[in-house]
Design a protein with these regions (language model features):
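Alpha-helix-loop-beta-strand connector modules within alpha/beta enzyme cores
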Residues: 48-67, 94-113, 143-168
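Structural preference for beta-strand elements that scaffold enzyme active sites
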Residues: 6-8, 33-36, 64-66, 80-83, ...
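Structural motif
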Residues: 30, 77, 123, 156, ...
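Short, acidic/polar
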Residues: 14-28, 69-72, 112-119, 168-173
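Histidine/lysine/aspartate-rich catalytic loop segments that bind and position anionic ligands
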Residues: 107-135
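Active-site mouth loops of central-metabolism enzymes
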Residues: 3-21, 105-111
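Glycine-rich phosphate-binding active-site loops on the catalytic face of alpha/beta enzymes
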Residues: 9-13, 82-95, 127-141, 167-195
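Conserved, mostly hydrophobic/aromatic
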Residues: 9, 27, 35, 74, ...
Length: 195
C-alpha cells in the first residue's frame, strides 16, 4: 500500500526551493491519488506549457492530474480532469455546465459549506475538496473548521471528499476516520526533500 495513495498534491511553485519540474517528478513518483496543477497566477500560455509537462509526468507514472480552472486549456491538451471553485461553477450557464460534464470524466470542486457541496454535486462534481479543516500557514488567521465539519459533510455527501487545510501525513488518519477519502497537501509536497 502506497503511503500517499489517499493524498492529493496541490501545486504551488513559489513554495519550491529549486527546480519546480524536478520537485514535481519527486512528488508524482510517490503516486499520490492525484495532482491538482494550481498555479493560478500564471498567464494562460505559461500555464498551458507547464500543464503539458505535468500531464506527461503524471501519465508516465499513472497519476491523475486535474487542471485548475482552465477549462479551455484542459480541453486543448486532452485533459479529462478539471478542478473548479464554487463561484466558477455557479457563474457558468446551463449549456456550459452541460459541456463540462460532457468533456470531463472527473470534476473536482472546492467547497466550504454543506450548501457548496450540494451545489457541486447537483452540477456534476465527482469529488469535493473540503476546507479549511485545520489552521494553515497558507491562510494565516483563518480558523480551521475541524474534524466535526468533515464528519458532518461526509455523512451526507454521495461522492468522495478530500479535506484541505493543515493536512499532513500525521493528520490524514483523522480525516479518513471522519469519512473523508483522503486529504490534500500543498507545502508537504512542495517542500518534500526526499526522493
Amino acid at each position: 500500500m502506497c503511503r500517499y495513495e489517499h493524498t492529493i498534491a496541490i501545486t504551488n511553485r513559489t513554495l519550491v526551493q529549486g527546480d519546480f519540474l524536478e520537485q514535481m517528478k519527486k512528488v508524482i513518483h510517490l503516486h499520490p491519488h492525484a495532482v491538482i496543477l494550481r498555479e493560478k497566477d500564471l498567464p494562460d500560455d505559461a500555464y498551458s506549457a507547464l500543464a503539458e509537462k505535468i500531464l506527461s509526468l503524471c501519465e508516465r507514472e499513472g497519476v491523475r492530474c486535474f487542471l485548475h480552472s482552465r477549462v479551455l486549456i484542459a480541453r486543448n491538451l486532452g485533459c479529462r480532469r478539471i478542478h473548479l471553485s464554487i463561484p466558477a461553477l455557479e457563474t457558468m450557464s446551463e449549456a456550459e455546465r452541460f459541456e463540462l460534464q460532457r468533456n470531463f470524466e472527473e470534476i473536482s470542486v472546492s467547497c466550504h459549506s454543506l450548501e457548496d457541496v450540494n451545489i457541486a454535486v447537483k452540477n456534476g462534481a465527482t469529488q469535493i475538496i473540503l476546507g479549511t479543516i485545520f489552521e494553515t500557514d497558507c491562510k494565516k488567521g483563518l480558523k480551521g473548521k475541524g474534524i466535526g465539519f468533515v464528519e458532518a459533510i461526509c455523512k451526507t455527501c454521495p461522492i468522495p471528499v478530500y479535506a484541505i487545510g493543515g493536512i499532513n501525513l500525521e493528520r490524514l488518519p483523522q480525516v479518513r476516520k471522519a469519512g473523508a477519502a483522503g486529504g490534500c497537501m500543498m507545502s508537504g509536497f512542495m517542500q518534500l526533500v526526499k526522493n
